[in-house]
């Protein structure tokens, strides 16, 4: 399988609409540019939807991809792998941080168990955990193809159900090790540059993590132009499915609000699977994991928030979601200088450009 067999060509957000949105924003009752990044976000959503002003974002969806990682047995995490399944149950029961944030923002949460370490099976399952990427492939060819198809199918389900913005989340002990290996491989960053503390590891565990990532990157050193091979060798079923989910969202012209290092590593892979997918990304926040900044720079993304978060689950992106909604609502609900009878700036038109709702 090659990516072109799975993903259609990605069309970019409407650049003509994007150019017109600045004039639209300048017609609103405020000094030009005074809403800062909120203006940029609103303009981006307009371009994604192909209309000015953009439709309000009333159907956001958080999809958390869960899986265990064989590399977790190498001492790279402060927690045992059993926590992954326990936290998945916590999310299902509504007791995790992402559930609280989602309820506050009026967003639903869906958990996808691709590869947690238990016997259950279903349409969204790929395997029970995965290979330890420092010494063996994460998946077989059959498994990676299944993971990619699952992620693509879930994106189609959510878009077909009316989702207007998607937030992928992650869950799984050891997944920051896998994410750092992917980021290092795609960006050619050294292992020590991309390795963070994950769940709060000590110095000895950090050294083990550096070693595991170094070995994984070495195993993938000749595969940078083959994203499916990289996914098979050094990712995991949950990250591969997440990458396909992100890639297909872009194919379906649906913006993706990115979370932390694991999600952004999957976004790097998604942009390789479906070139141009990054044009549909917004970075919700910058996490404390070093690899996250490396990945954001590679995708040319400037995050909305920087709150020192590193939880995962989609929590940072979900926290940023209200600001994205505000950016859209400002374009819909603010008065223009003309409609409000307010004098605009000197030597400038106060009329908004013609709205395009096609």
UniProtKB/Swiss-Prot annotation:
Which Gene3D superfamilies does the record associate with it? 1.10.1610.10, 3.40.50.10210
Q: What class of enzyme is it?
A: transferase
Which organism encodes this protein? Corynebacterium glutamicum (strain ATCC 13032 / DSM 20300 / JCM 1318 / BCRC 11384 / CCUG 27702 / LMG 3730 / NBRC 12168 / NCIMB 10025 / NRRL B-2784 / 534)
What the protein does? Answer: Catalyzes the synthesis of alpha-ribazole-5'-phosphate from nicotinate mononucleotide (NAMN) and 5,6-dimethylbenzimidazole (DMB).
Report the Pfam families cross-referenced here. DBI_PRT (PF02277)
Q: Which UniProt keywords apply?
A: Cobalamin biosynthesis, Glycosyltransferase, Transferase
Name of the encoding gene: cobT
Query: Catalytic activity, per the record?
Result: 5,6-dimethylbenzimidazole + nicotinate beta-D-ribonucleotide = alpha-ribazole 5'-phosphate + nicotinate + H(+)
The EC number(s) this enzyme carries: 2.4.2.21
Catalytic positions?
313
Biochemical pathway: Nucleoside biosynthesis; alpha-ribazole biosynthesis; alpha-ribazole from 5,6-dimethylbenzimidazole: step 1/2
**UniProt similarity note:** Belongs to the CobT family.
InterPro entries for the chain: Nict_dMeBzImd_PRibTrfase (IPR003200), Nict_dMeBzImd_PRibTrfase_bact (IPR017846), Nict_dMeBzImd_PRibTrfase_N (IPR023195), Nict_dMeBzImd_PRibTrfase_sf (IPR036087)
Q: What is this protein called?
A: Nicotinate-nucleotide--dimethylbenzimidazole phosphoribosyltransferase
**GO molecular function list:** nicotinate-nucleotide-dimethylbenzimidazole phosphoribosyltransferase activity
GO BP? cobalamin biosynthetic process
């Amino acid at each position: 399988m090659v990516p072109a067999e799975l993903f259609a060509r990605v069309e970019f957000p409407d650049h003509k609409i994007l150019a017109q949105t600045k004039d639209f924003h300048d017609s609103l009752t405020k000094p030009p540019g005074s809403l800062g990044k909120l203006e940029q976000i609103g303009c981006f959503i307009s371009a994604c939807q192909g209309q000015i002003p953009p439709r309000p974002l009333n159907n956001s969806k958080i999809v958390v991809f869960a899986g265990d990682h064989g590399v977790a047995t190498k001492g790279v995490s402060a927690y045992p792998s059993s926590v992954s399944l326990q936290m998945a149950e916590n999310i299902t029961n509504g007791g995790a941080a992402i559930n609280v944030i989602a309820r506050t923002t009026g967003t639903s949460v869906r958990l996808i168990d691709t590869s947690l370490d238990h016997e259950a099976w279903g349409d969204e399952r790929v395997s029970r955990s995965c290979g330890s990427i420092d010494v063996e492939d994460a998946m077989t060819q059959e498994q990676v193809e299944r993971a990619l198809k699952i992620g693509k199918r879930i994106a189609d389900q959510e878009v077909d159900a009316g989702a207007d913005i998607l937030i992928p989340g992650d869950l799984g002990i050891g997944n920051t090790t896998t994410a750092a290996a992917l980021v290092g491989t795609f960006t050619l960053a050294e292992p020590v540059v991309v390795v963070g503390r994950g769940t709060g590891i000590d110095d000895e565990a950090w050294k083990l993590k550096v070693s595991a990532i170094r070995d994984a990157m070495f195993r993938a050193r000749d595969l940078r132009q083959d994203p499916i091979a990289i996914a098979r060798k050094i990712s995991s079923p949950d990250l591969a499915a997440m990458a396909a989910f992100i890639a297909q969202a872009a194919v379906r012209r649906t913006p993706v609000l990115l979370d932390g290092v694991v999600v952004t590593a999957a976004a790097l892979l998604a942009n390789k699977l479906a070139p141009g997918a990054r044009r549909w990304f917004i970075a919700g926040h910058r996490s404390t994991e070093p690899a996250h900044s490396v990945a954001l720079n590679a995708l040319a993304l400037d995050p909305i928030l920087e709150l020192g978060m590193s939880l995962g689950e989609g929590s940072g992106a979900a926290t940023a979601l209200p600001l994205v909604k505000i950016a859209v609502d400002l374009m819909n609900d603010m008065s223009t200088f003309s409609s409000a009878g307010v004098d605009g700036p000197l030597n400038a038109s106060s009329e908004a450009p013609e709205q395009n709702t096609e």
